[in-house]
Regions:
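A glycine/serine/threonine-rich, flexible loop-to-helix segment
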Residues: 161-162, 213-221
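C-terminal substrate-binding subdomain of Rossmann-fold SDR/epimerase-dehydratase oxidoreductases
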Residues: 21, 45-48, 84, 224-343
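Residue-level recognition of oxygen-bearing side chains
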Residues: 91, 122, 129, 168, ...
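Hydrophobic alpha-helix immediately C-terminal to the catalytic Tyr-X-X-X-Lys motif of short-chain
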Residues: 182, 186, 190, 220, ...
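N-terminal Rossmann-like NAD(P)+-binding domain of SDR-like oxidoreductases, especially those catalyzing
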Residues: 10-206, 256, 320
């Protein structure tokens, strides 16, 4: 399907994706969660760089599976898609038996703080057992590196800002955050005990085209475009460090390259700025072109008051520099949602 391939190559040039030294010759990679929001963007970047790719995704019903199917539209015929759950060890073992992977990008997870409070067992099964299955498979099949998508939620109610990788993490406040912190610890163990080179990346509120429909920017944009009321939890003073998806993908690729220099690292990948919920709503209003009717609801359990990434380490070691400011990114996202008619 040459048209799809050329489309991937065009996106790679447009976004400026670069794979540094692992781009010297084509490699084979596994991307778990590759049909999701971040995973599909990463998969396009890897294919555009000429790599062989297998995507492992269970296409679960956390949101409409048709969204994930559409995320992969440009990759049909370019990648192998394995439909399966990472918590099913038989699926993982079969995938690794049939392929010889140079590296694994592990983005598959049950996502979201609030749903994890309602169903912690599901989150532990997928995010912990699933991660362990993958690490074991890497160990036994000679995989060179493992990039793990962690989360800023591991910082919990840390009052020191910006958050640094060297900060003491006293306690997490949601099952989701606990599973991500456990994943980091498992990666550390496998790097130390078995020589698997692991990079753990703490993502800070990623947004952009294809983002999940349950995320705030998606919900606000959909509501405004459809003339519906916006639900705002709390007084709007909570603040987040929003990171555009293209910047996250660049950071992931740079971290994969860094496995040639270090066996284990933790990196913050964020926008290095904070935006309050009220400011965010105002930006979406401006991008859409009209004001919102807001319904205030109580604060939600498990939500932290503020996130803010210190990206000094990623800048120094990875050459990571977020390029898309929040106002520009919101405009891009609203334009995409309008053109996609996802309201």
């Amino acid at each position: 399907m040459p048209d799809q391939k050329s489309g991937c190559q065009a996106r790679g040039i447009l976004f400026g994706f670069k794979l540094l030294s692992i781009n010297i010759s084509p490699k084979k990679f596994l991307v778990t969660g590759g049909a999701g929001f971040i995973g599909s963007h990463l998969s396009e970047a890897l294919v555009s760089a000429g790599h062989d790719l297998v995507i492992l995704d269970d296409f679960n019903d956390y949101y409409d599976p048709a969204v994930k199917e559409n995320n992969l539209a440009s990759l049909r015929g370019e990648v192998e898609i394995v439909r399966g759950d990472i918590s099913d060890d038989a699926v993982v073992v079969d995938t690794f038996t049939r392929h010889r992977f140079d590296g694994v990008f592990h983005l598959a997870a049950r996502a979201g703080v609030r749903p994890s409070i309602a169903n912690p067992r599901l989150y532990f099964n997928t995010n912990m057992d699933g991660t362990l299955n993958l690490l074991e498979a890497c160990r036994h099949h000679g995989v060179k590196f493992f990039v793990f998508a962690s989360s800023s939620s591991v910082y919990g109610v840390n009052t020191k800002v910006p958050f640094s990788e060297t900060d003491l993490i006293a306690r997490t406040i949601s099952p989701y955050a606990a599973t991500k912190l456990a994943g980091e610890q498992m990666c550390s163990n496998y790097a130390h005990l078995f020589g698997l080179r692991c990079m753990c990346l703490r993502f800070f509120t990623v947004y952009g085209p294809r983002q999940r429909p349950d995320l705030a920017i998606s919900k606000f944009t959909s509501a405004l475009l459809a003339g519906r009321t916006i639900d705002r939890y709390g007084d709007g003073s909570t603040a987040r460090d929003y990171t555009y998806v293209d910047d996250i993908v660049r950071g992931i690729l740079a971290a994969a390259d860094y496995t040639e220099k270090s066996s284990f690292e933790i990196f913050n990948l964020g926008g290095a700025a904070t935006t309050t919920l009220n400011e965010l709503i105002g930006m979406v209003e401006k991008a859409v072109g009209h004001s919102a009717e807001i319904r205030q609801l109580p604060d939600q359990p498990g939500d932290v008051p503020r996130t803010y990434a210190d990206v000094t380490k990623a800048e120094r070691l990875l050459g990571y520099h977020p390029q898309t400011a929040i106002r520009e990114g919101i405009t891009k996202y609203v334009d995409w949602q309008r053109s996609s008619q996802v309201v």
